[in-house]
Amino acid sequence: MVCNLAIDAYYGCMADFSHILMTRPDFGDDDREWLHQLVADWQVIADLSFADLLLILQNGEGKYIIAEQCRPSTVMSLRAEDVVGNVVPESLCAELDAAMDSESVFRSSKLRTVGKAKVCNVYAPVRHNGKMLGLVVRETNMATRESNGRYESESISAGKQLYEMIPRGQFPYRNPVMNQRHNARVADGFIVLTV
């Protein structure tokens, strides 16, 4: 992972989500609020999917920056280090450009290596009020897909359904389901309701 020294210097060694959002003056308050709601609620997707999530935005200079990350509580994370504020390597930019142009979930054509793990990247474009804001990357360690039982298979399927709602603007929910956001924990169990 390549670290952007200019961003580190600008933010004083450690970038945070709010500061990264400030590099985008074209984002309105509504856009920022949508992204804040997304990262407040996305833990359930990481947990159900057994995958790390990254929110990638383009900064004011057009470089792809990791704006936020989410580690799953249901499986070991791929990343021990904090990658918020890091510039995405040039080798991934063409794939990110293609994902930004996609109307739905976009799957990487090749596996990547993160640490010692083989990883499949899947990208969900984040749009709000017709404006492209960025991408949520689901980084799946392929070792977690080798021998799944029914619980794991159902969990992955439910996580995939929620993840696919992001490009459609259906996740996060506009109104919180409970009085507080991010209450539920997948490890306690889950129920899938179909209508």
What are these regions (language model features)?
Residues 39-40, 92-119, 163-186:
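Short, basic/aromatic recognition patches
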Residues 90-154:
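Sensory/regulatory domains in signal-transduction proteins
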